[in-house]
């Protein structure tokens, strides 16, 4: 199945479908367009050279190399992450299983519907090999402020979540978790490397390849047919 991006159809939580200045801020300092004329200093002789950089794409080499390494990874299965209890988990344990990877939050307007539907989908398909990997993130409106134990208690007590929940991560900016660098580099869509909001979703096939990316406004139930296709493949 070739990767595709399910486009945004409606605004959510007050954010328009097009990237806003707020979401643009999550790009961090590594990616910027510039139309100014700049001076470049040669460190060997101290000479400044005036040059035009109109429409030049500026990329900090350090951040670029991090993204390049993530893109070079062959699949999701090449990564090791920490679970909600701080234990290392090699994602190769999920080989042969379709995955839905979601950045979650406990205090979002999308929390109740997403957690409820995710739990129902997991209960329905877990015995067929389907897995949901939830990554808490506090980058969107500060809506996941709790500690890992608090997040775990919330998800497992209120929504009876049985799917794996992992350590809190950044999904945008210079501290982006390696797994999310990989997901975004393989499923850019029109948003490029920006995660728009809580509950954005990546569907991964049995070989660890990203095959679909869904905006936060796509409910888990809307993804069910795509999950069934991967289970049958």
Swiss-Prot record:
Entry GO terms, CC: chloroplast; plasma membrane
Protein name per the record: Putative glutathione peroxidase 7, chloroplastic
Entries under InterPro entries matching the protein: Glutathione_peroxidase, GPX_AS, GPX_CS, Thioredoxin-like_sf, Thioredoxin_domain
PANTHER family assigned: GLUTATHIONE PEROXIDASE (PTHR11592), GLUTATHIONE PEROXIDASE 7, CHLOROPLASTIC-RELATED (PTHR11592:SF132)
Main location: plastid
Active-site residue list: 108
SUPFAM superfamilies associated with the record: Thioredoxin-like
Documented EC number(s): 1.11.1.9
Keyword flag rRNA processing: no
Family, per entry: Belongs to the glutathione peroxidase family.
Family matches, as CDD domains: GSH_Peroxidase
Transit peptide: 1-69
Reactions it catalyzes: 2 glutathione + H2O2 = glutathione disulfide + 2 H2O
Keywords attached to this entry: Chloroplast, Oxidoreductase, Peroxidase, Plastid, Transit peptide
One of the GO BP terms on file: response to oxidative stress
Enzyme superclass (EC): oxidoreductase
Native source species: Arabidopsis thaliana
Cell compartment(s), UniProt: Plastid, Chloroplast
Taxonomic lineage of the native organism: Eukaryota, Viridiplantae, Streptophyta, Embryophyta, Tracheophyta
Function: May constitute a glutathione peroxidase-like protective system against oxidative stresses.
Molecular function GO labels: glutathione peroxidase activity
